[in-house]
Amino acid sequence: MEKSKNIWSLILTEIKKELSEEEFYVWFENLCFLESVGDNIKISTPNLFHKNQIEKRFTKKIKEILTNNGYDNVTIVFTNQSPKTYSSKEESEKTTFNETFPTLDKLKGTTLSKEPLQSIKDRIKMYIKKEEEPKNFKNPFLKKRYTFENFIIGPNNKLAYNASLSISKNPGTKYNPCLIYGGVGLGKTHLLQSIGNKTEELHNNLKILYVTAENFLNEFVESIKTHETKKFKKKYRYLDMLLIDDIHDLQKKEGIQEELFHTFNALYEDNKQLVFTCDRPPSELTNFTDRLKSRFTRGLNVDISKPNFELRVAIIEKKAEEDGIKVPKNILNLVAQKVTTNVRDLEAAVTKLKAYIDLDNIEIDIDIVEKIIKEIIIYEKETTNEPSNKINIENIKKILLRELKIAHKDIEGHSKKPEITKARHIYAYLLRNFTELSTIEIGKIIGGKTHSTVLYSINKIDRDRNKDKEINNLITELMNKIKKN
């Protein structure tokens, strides 16, 4: 036992030579010699975090010290087991660090920091957790109903699904950070929650937190009011995985953006997984700091678009099965044909069908389905300003084709003739200025173009208007005619 204590004291002496006073205090002052079994020397750490960090930072150096001093066969084993769990006999035999090596108080002199010891202790409280960390970090916002197994995969979301599943299996590796973007009700939250649930299942030792951007903001504001910002930072910067939903809700909120920036850096630099969802690509976020947007684009940005007909049918079938109702094929196809907005609206249609069956005890016919569809479409228009978008799109297209003498099939086709390409650039620019459509939605309207292509078109017309008077006059004339209609 005495030999083992001497070996541990030797290790401390050698490491002390290479660390600053504060580093040495942070990592080694609270270590405690527990016991030696054979060639294993067991050392107690204050908590699991401390244990993991000690092993990560100093294992190589400790092995080097042992080898250089002829103790190749000796192994230092760190544990977060408390010395209090040992018997009184073992307690009387163990030697703490303070007994085998001088404390900072004894070491104080001209070579040490002039800063008071208590001040050092206060500063490092943010760095070392003094309390034992829970083995399982419970996340109150993760809902078990969201799983990869009940997520319906189609061409519109397959890439996002595969990336999300990969993240769950190997967090903090390939796709970090990851940002999933797309319109309302397309499954972003489902995937984000599924990542949390699957990761918790596969890696139950990890600390995973799912929050909406609104919750994140509210917590931050509350921490300022109660003077507990340190607690807020500590909560979010010791995570293994942070999932934030609807990041676009933080637009125009500089204070929380600043906090998110530093939280992002702290986690990213420690290879912790970050996943966000947004209703648009990062480049389209307004009143959002450039340095934060650049952080989002470091990893994978993947979009989810509206479901095609086949996927809409599959979604309705699955929802009907879950609700225990049988939907005739003609009814199912009618709903899938008419409700083209998103998954949420499709499920709402099935819920309404179930209500008619359960509450009114009637058979579903075409008239009832038409009524349900009409209610959903009217509500969708009211909440998304869709009428003005649809009117504008038709007006824009009509005026553009007429003024530029371009055929309908060409503007939405793949012709690379200069005049057609130019017309597409203008079309994208006008759609961007007269509607609330995202670049992804605009891309689909003008022939399946990508977000990057649409953004290029918009920026090109912007540049051309500034340097080409003829182009500027043409765009101004087109915009005036669209406004009149």
Swiss-Prot record:
This protein's UniProt keywords: ATP-binding, Cytoplasm, DNA replication, DNA-binding, Lipid-binding, Nucleotide-binding
Underlying gene: dnaA
Gene Ontology cellular component list: cytoplasm; plasma membrane
Region annotation Domain IV, binds dsDNA: where it falls in the sequence: 358-485
A GO term, aspect molecular function: DNA replication origin binding
Official protein name in the record: Chromosomal replication initiator protein DnaA
Family affiliation: Belongs to the DnaA family.
Subunit details: Oligomerizes as a right-handed, spiral filament on DNA at oriC.
Domain of life: Bacteria
Main function: Plays an essential role in the initiation and regulation of chromosomal replication. ATP-DnaA binds to the origin of replication (oriC) to initiate formation of the DNA replication initiation complex once per cell cycle. Binds the DnaA box (a 9 base pair repeat at the origin) and separates the double-stranded (ds)DNA. Forms a right-handed helical filament on oriC DNA; dsDNA binds to the exterior of the filament while single-stranded (ss)DNA is stabiized in the filament's interior.
Organism: Borreliella afzelii (strain PKo) (Borrelia afzelii)
Gene3D superfamilies xrefs: 1.10.1750.10, 1.10.8.60, 3.30.300.180, P-loop containing nucleotide triphosphate hydrolases (3.40.50.300)
Domain I, interacts with DnaA modulators: region residues: 1-74
Comment field on protein domains: Domain I is involved in oligomerization and binding regulators, domain II is flexibile and of varying length in different bacteria, domain III forms the AAA+ region, while domain IV binds dsDNA.
Coiled coil: none
Region (Domain II): 74-140
Localisation per UniProt entry: Cytoplasm
Annotated segments matching region Domain III, AAA+ region: 141-357
Single GO biological process annotation from the record: regulation of DNA replication
